[in-house]
Amino acid sequence: MKRIAFLTPYKHLPNFKKNVESKYKCLDLSDLTELEQKYSIQTSDYLFSAPNYQKFQITDDFIKNTKISMVVSPSTGTNHIDVSIPVISIKNDKVLENIWSTAEHNLYLMLSLPRNTKNIVELHEKALGILGYGRLGKMIEHICKPIFKNVYTSDINYTDSQFFNETDFLSINVDLRDENIGMIDSEYISKFQK
């Protein structure tokens, strides 16, 4: 039976856990340090890693002298993985259309922001700007429209006319690729009126 080393938690997903444990020998290494994980993956065939729990980048050095032939990540980005072996990512997969956890986490962070400032604000009086209007941006718009006074969007080929004038909170949902690095700089921030 093939072995999967889980560098990040997976047991909180009962259906996934049941399915994967019926097909593979699963090693839960999520509570170990990076060094302990590196030592423990020696006999595994695959690695599983979710970026929101991982505190380091998986590199060729990390998997050197192991049997690891593939890295699996339940994520749309792979900036936490830099290896020469195959990486399976679910970016643009239809299964993502019904997974709202990242959008909900984004909302949670937005809800916590006003509570961590000296000036308490009510979101129903504020405008949300969504930078990046792909799958995640559309989900955020859907769950935030009932909460914010207005929601404005901006993407590669379109920006709402009031986006820079009215945005109080900015949700950044662009993918990590070379052309987006440095996109949010002082010049970009200076476009906002509030």
Which residue stretches match the model-derived regions?
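Phosphate-coordination loops involved in phosphoryl transfer and adenosine-cofactor binding
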Residues: 1, 124-127, 194
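Phosphate/diphosphate ligand-binding glycine-rich loop within oxidoreductases
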Residues: 45-118
